[in-house]
Amino acid sequence: MTGGMALSHKTMTKSISSITGNTNKQISIKAARSNFEREPLIRPFGFKGGYMTEIWQTASMLESESGARKVGLCSQSVLWSDASVFAAHSESGGNALMYAMTEYALTLLKGRSFNNPIDLLDEILEPVYDYGKKITNNNKLRETFALNALVSVDNAAWLLYAKENNIDSFDDMIPGEYKETLSHHHDKVASIPLMAYTIPIKEISEAVDDGYFFMKVKIGQPGTQEEMLEKDKNRLSEIHKAIGHVTTGHTENGKIPYYFDANGRYEKKETLLKLLDHADKIKALDQIAVIEEPFPEDREITVGDIGLRIAADESAHTDKDAIKRIEMGYNAIALKAIAKTLSMTLKIARVAHEKNVPCFCADLTVSPVLVEWNKAVAARLAPFPGLNMGLLETNGHQNYKNRDEMISYHPYPDAPWRKTREGLFFLDQDYYQKSGGIFKDSIHYLSLIH
């Protein structure tokens, strides 16, 4: 337990033995259905060389034979999960394909029984993935596209599992073999904003003034490799000039860390090294804490000789992929319970933990309710190197046009632990007792289904 005042695990959770005997209950799914709504963005959101203007919010409901009903949520990201699908279709068309995979998964679940959500995901992932290849006419469809489509289904399965087994805390819900991986209870988690291509430098400076101290910056801008590199060098120079001198008490060196996300846009290691040479020239190199997904996944470029912390995200589709990336020199993993399902995230996190590879939680521009699923993981991971706390990227407040209305859908919209203050989430006993509100139904999303 870390991060300032450590909260007692015993005060937050029931003993594991108190729920033993219920956790293997066979749950039969009587009904499954879904719906979605579109949430517009404030401005076009750019990464991977593309731009999206809205995010589909999907809700999946599972009902058991006992009459229990639970709704899981998903914020779809076609561009993130498979840029080739995004490029081959209209924005709505790509979203419709992913949603069709969610609907297909629900048809597979009707009449099916399960003991735990992890096994359930293992059973349906391959057929849903194969269905996705068929409807997208893309035999090279990225597996992350299928996982993204299954987030709402998986969340609903976890909530139904908890309901049927009388579990009301995140700690008790996590199976025993994963508890060591998520054994911390931080009282602070760093809140990381995202600076996409179109975010003005003025807004980046304002974010720092508001207390944010760990900055995620999208690199790999549109254009040829040469054009991309020049744009990224200029962007880095502008950002470093604006905030590079700012000090913080939250890091070991007192400087603001930069977290670059290239989303696989750098086709060669030499090109990335040119960007890092530029960073060195402007004295920004020592502030680069993480570079996420610099290279295309299919290039299989090793990264152990780059000399910085390189994180895998979308290339670590599964726990097996995470092992491969670690063997290639990747020394951090960006976890996304809100993009690859909680079930798969637990597997990936355990692999990383066993190999002493630090993890943090990255966003997918998800809804305020879904932020809590990511926060639940970030709050329990080992502290990130150089910090005495967990890391959680969240950027929905920067991008959703109707963000205030979306906050009202949260079961505890006014809870202090829901909000970022001075670049931090402060997580007290109330937060851990309520598990961020994930077990309490959201009236809005219930009504979307019913």
Language model feature labels by segment:
Residues K14-M61, E65:
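Short, Gly/Pro- and small/polar-rich lid/capping loops
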Residues M1-S15:
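N-terminal export signals
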Residues K70-N165:
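Metal- or metallocofactor-binding catalytic centers and their adjacent structured scaffolds
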Residues I219-E372:
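Catalytic core of soluble alpha/beta enzymes
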Residues E206-G220:
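Catalytic domains of carbohydrate-active enzymes, especially glycoside hydrolases
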Residues T365-H450:
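Flexible C-terminal active-site loop/helix
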Residues S60, G67, V153, N166, ...:
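Conserved, mostly hydrophobic/aromatic
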Residues H185-K202, I219-Q221, E267, A311:
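Active-site mouth loops of central-metabolism enzymes
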